[in-house]
Amino acid sequence: MDEKYDAALDLLRRLNPNNLTENLQRIIGLEPELAEDLLSSIDVPLKVQQDSKQSGRPFLCCDYNRDVDSYRSPWSNEYFPELSAEDLQESPFPSESLRSLEVLANDSFDVYRDLYYEGGISSVYLWDLDEEGEFAGVVLFKKEGSNKESWDSIHVIEATKGNDDETFTYRLTSTIILALDNKQNDTSLAGNLTRQTEKEAKIDTSNTDISHITNLGTLIEDIESQLRTQLEIVYFEKTRDIFHQTRSQKSTTDSQEQQQKEVIKGLQNL
């Protein structure tokens, strides 16, 4: 089982990242027993669904807000498409207190999205952990452009109590999925970048919700800035260097071929 899982991951790393979703489904079709492990460990571009109970307001879909083939909206707290009454009884929902924090988080990160992304869609989903007051969740951002260009940010969070009631440890696993496509010269660039970080922070016990939003907002803002910088300075620059080197080698090869043709032509004229 482990060998098949490792082989699947290795194969996905070598295939075109633009076709990640399709390739993942094909592998699961071949080895269904790998489905749960692969879906929980492989981040794919986020889907968009509409909340018909909130005037068709869009929300983002991932494995964390999915139940059966439906997705829970952060706006109405209902599943779309609608689940049967039997399935709905078993469907996961946040507790009442955590739902209050989830609503505040969605409103807050919607403002963040508007300021930093100048468009796009954001969604936040939270779920309870075993210890009272602790929770986990995911913060999602998606911005699409023309020609299938897209930026997906997936931040999986875990908030657990520290040594005292006023301290929380926030663990964050962030993934950026980027796709760029230039139709004019048939050039595309796609891939993903994942980083983990952890931070301890104080909370105001008289207003824990605001404290959690402030701490998570600061943490996500910092990691997104770092990832953007890393993509721009490290990965884009390295890709450009490889591209220029390839073009330079091709020019050198073309020049050598021309010189060889001239030598052969000269010998033929002797």
UniProtKB/Swiss-Prot annotation:
Pfam families: F_actin_cap_B
Gene Ontology molecular function, alphabetical: actin filament binding
Main subcellular location of this protein, as a coarse class: cytoplasm
Polar residues compositional bias, start-end: 245-258
Keyword annotations from UniProtKB, A to Z: Actin capping, Actin-binding, Cytoplasm, Cytoskeleton
Keyword Cytoplasm: yes
SUPFAM superfamilies recorded: Subunits of heterodimeric actin filament capping protein Capz
Superkingdom of the organism of origin: Eukaryota
CC annotations in GO: actin body; actin cortical patch; F-actin capping protein complex; mating projection tip; medial cortex; nucleus
Coiled-coil regions listed: none
Location(s), subcellular: Cytoplasm, Cytoskeleton, Actin patch; Cytoplasm, Cytoskeleton
PANTHER family assigned to the protein according to its UniProt record, in alphabetical order: F-ACTIN-CAPPING PROTEIN SUBUNIT BETA, F-ACTIN-CAPPING PROTEIN SUBUNIT BETA ISOFORMS 1 AND 2
Oligomer status and interactors: Component of the F-actin capping complex, composed of a heterodimer of an alpha and a beta subunit.
Primary role: F-actin-capping proteins bind in a Ca(2+)-independent manner to the fast growing ends of actin filaments (barbed end) thereby blocking the exchange of subunits at these ends. Unlike other capping proteins (such as gelsolin and severin), these proteins do not sever actin filaments.
Protein name: F-actin-capping protein subunit beta
Gene that produces this protein: CAP2
